[in-house]
Each structure stands twice: as C-alpha cells, then as structure tokens.
Amino acid sequence: MSEPTSRRPAYARLLDRAVRILAVRDHSEQELRRKLSAPVMGKNGPEEIDATADDYERVIAWCHEHHYLDDERFVMRFIASRSRKGYGPARIRQELNQKGISRESTEKAMRECEIDWSEMAREQAVRKYGEPLPSNFSEKVKVQRFLLYRGYLMDDIQQIWRNFAD
C-alpha cells in the first residue's frame, strides 16, 4: 500500500503528477509548469504542493530526460491534430503561441508539416457551403469570413476561386 501523500516528499508528488498529466496527452513545457503549480483537488478541497522552484526544475528535467516532455513532438502532433479538425495555419500559430511555444519552433514545424493549406481551406468551404462554392459576392464574403475565422490566410482563400475559375 502506498504511503499517504502528505508524508511523501514534494518532489515525488510533483513527479507523480507530471507523469499522470503527460500520460493523457503531450503538453508543452509551459503548460506542464502551469498545471503542476495549480492546486490539487484533495478530499478537503484544493491543496497546494509545498514544492520549491528547484523541485519543479528537477521534475521538468526528469520529464525531458525520459522523453515524457518534448516540445518539438508536441508541436508536430498539435499541428496535425488541429489541421485534421479544419483549422488553418494562422489559428494554429496563435494557439501554439498561447501554449508557450516559440515562434521559431512553430515556423520550423509549419514548414516541415507538408500540409496543402489552400486545399484544406477548399475542403472546409465545401463541407460548410456545399459544391459548387457560391459565386455571388455576398456569399463569397460569407465563405471568406468563415475561413478567416478558422485561421486560413487570405492567399489560400483567394486561391480557391482562382482554381475554381480555371
């Protein structure tokens, strides 16, 4: 039987928590730090883990060392996941920025992902508005606004009608 959590050192409790968090899905380092520093729900309500900054650094280092935490892998999987859900490059970049991923890492991963964003934009437009895509101005504006909200770039959106006209 395991010993009560109050008797376990803060480092051990943090490490256990980090592994449980990372077992569910990949996280960026910043996300993991935020989740580790948040209070834990205990039997008597939220409980703080009385860990030092050194404990947090040791846990993060352990996760990197044992390949539980890898920002590059996280970025590639995040881009693949969000693009499968129909989101464009601008929105994905913004979400990665919010998750603490550097602009350089994001741009490198976006170049390596080999996704045809204009084709994805067309698929999203067809899924929402049907085939053939609207050709009158007011309907085109609706499609454009929808795709911009989903995070597609204006060049990719305009490419839809250029290819459609050909």
Swiss-Prot record:
GO terms for biological process: regulation of DNA repair. GO terms for cellular component: cytoplasm. Pfam families: RecX_HTH1 (PF21982), RecX_HTH2 (PF02631), RecX_HTH3 (PF21981). Gene3D superfamilies: Winged helix-like DNA-binding domain superfamily/Winged helix DNA-binding domain. Keywords: Cytoplasm. It is found in: Cytoplasm. The keyword Transmembrane helix does not apply. Belongs to the RecX family. PANTHER family: REGULATORY PROTEIN RECX FAMILY PROTEIN. NCBIfam families: PRK00117.1-1. Modulates RecA activity. This is Regulatory protein RecX. The gene is recX.
